[in-house]
Amino acid sequence: MSATLALTEQLIARASVTPDDQHCQQIMTERLAALGFDCETVASHGVTNLWAVKRGTDGRDGKLLAFAGHTDVVPTGPLEQWTSPPFVPAHRDGKLYGRGAADMKTSLAAFVVAAEEFVAAHPDHRGAIAFLITSDEEGPATDGTVKVVELLESRGERLDYCIVGEPTSTAELGDVVKNGRRGSMSGELIVKGVQGHIAYPHLAKNPIHLLAPALAELAAEQWDEGNEYFPPTTWQVSNLRAGTGATNVIPGHADLLFNFRFSTASTVEGLQARVHAILDKHQLDYTLKWTVSGLPFLTPRGELSNALEHAIRAETGLTTELSTTGGTSDGRFIARICPQVIEFGPPNGSIHKIDEHIEVRFVEPLKNVYRRVLEQLIA
């Protein structure tokens, strides 16, 4: 069994459901410390974070390449639906099964082993290697990567390159990498009416009826046309609640939850202003609370994307696709202190599902791609 596969299994065996790290970072820290990394634990409200860095011969003047990832996994769902226990690594039909196999314990193991091989081959490497690891990516993400980024900002620390080990591939390893992500902004809208008997609508104000025309306009709105890198901004309703459950009561209020996934073609302030303008146009009595989960970020083609594309082609023969589709990731926080952030990891077809798995044939090539990038950028 390869060192990468063995470490992957060791990490999968830890039931590290958010925010419980279950000592995964301790396993990583022991191996990184043996390589000469300075390892620092950053704890926050039950979340465990790791910042580990190994400087090269250029010291602080050298380029710094960081790997960012998370040790936490999503809950398993019904255990009886799993073919084998989710935290007992199992091999079947050329696949390794277990919660976190694809998202993202294989990536964690691959970069640790890549760093070990790189340091052994290049003991006098010029640039620096760092790990930014959290146990709060799958949850609220309020005490994880963002806290480490804030700490690094306070120290004036800057990263030159960052690879986030998210499972970006689809059918084959390396067919897709993410060089950006859309922003995410949610709204909690309460439209006020007047409760009353449904037989006497003239004595009440039905908030659902009041909201409906504005809702139709919001759903039909073209927020932007996107751009070269991003699809158009989308607006979607996630929840609509009103009423007591009775058939003869007009509700006193209607509650709407919605979400924007927005590109760099729009701004937070601009989208908020347009929503308020539509609601005000329909003369609604409302309150609206906004939550911005992350801003869009984009890494144009440059040293990191070139190195990653070259490494993927050399290892797999594939020409990779740069993409900004999908949900948010911790890359949105890291982009504040790093001009080049790209996400790359194994295929994502089974993530967050029963019987999550990774094809074993992808494990060593993933490690090799990571090692090739280290060699190209900081050796």
From Swiss-Prot:
Disulfide bonds, paired cysteine numbers: none
Binding site for Zn(2+) 2: D103, E138, H352
InterPro entries recorded: ArgE/DapE_CS (IPR001261), Bact_exopeptidase_dim_dom (IPR036264), DapE_proteobac (IPR005941), Peptidase_M20 (IPR002933), Peptidase_M20_dimer (IPR011650), Peptidase_M20A (IPR050072)
Note on cofactor: Binds 2 Zn(2+) or Co(2+) ions per subunit.
GO MF term (any one): acetylornithine deacetylase activity
Keywords: Amino-acid biosynthesis, Cobalt, Diaminopimelate biosynthesis, Hydrolase, Lysine biosynthesis, Metal-binding, Zinc
Catalytic-site annotation from UniProt: D72, E137 (proton acceptor)
Associated pathway: Amino-acid biosynthesis; L-lysine biosynthesis via DAP pathway; LL-2,6-diaminopimelate from (S)-tetrahydrodipicolinate (succinylase route): step 3/3
Binding site for Zn(2+) 1: H70, D103, E166
Cofactor: Zn(2+); Co(2+)
A biological-process GO annotation: lysine biosynthetic process via diaminopimelate
PROSITE patterns according to UniProt: ARGE_DAPE_CPG2_1 (PS00758)
EC id: 3.5.1.18
SUPFAM superfamilies: Bacterial exopeptidase dimerisation domain, Zn-dependent exopeptidases
UniProt xrefs under Gene3D superfamilies: Zn peptidases (3.40.630.10)
Catalytic activity line of the entry: N-succinyl-(2S,6S)-2,6-diaminopimelate + H2O = (2S,6S)-2,6-diaminopimelate + succinate
Self-association state and partner proteins as the record states: Homodimer.
Family, as annotated: Belongs to the peptidase M20A family. DapE subfamily.
PANTHER family: ACETYLORNITHINE DEACETYLASE, N-ACETYL-L-CITRULLINE DEACETYLASE
Functional summary from the UniProt entry: Catalyzes the hydrolysis of N-succinyl-L,L-diaminopimelic acid (SDAP), forming succinate and LL-2,6-diaminopimelate (DAP), an intermediate involved in the bacterial biosynthesis of lysine and meso-diaminopimelic acid, an essential component of bacterial cell walls.
NCBIfam families assigned: dapE_proteo, PRK13009.1
Listed name of the protein: Succinyl-diaminopimelate desuccinylase
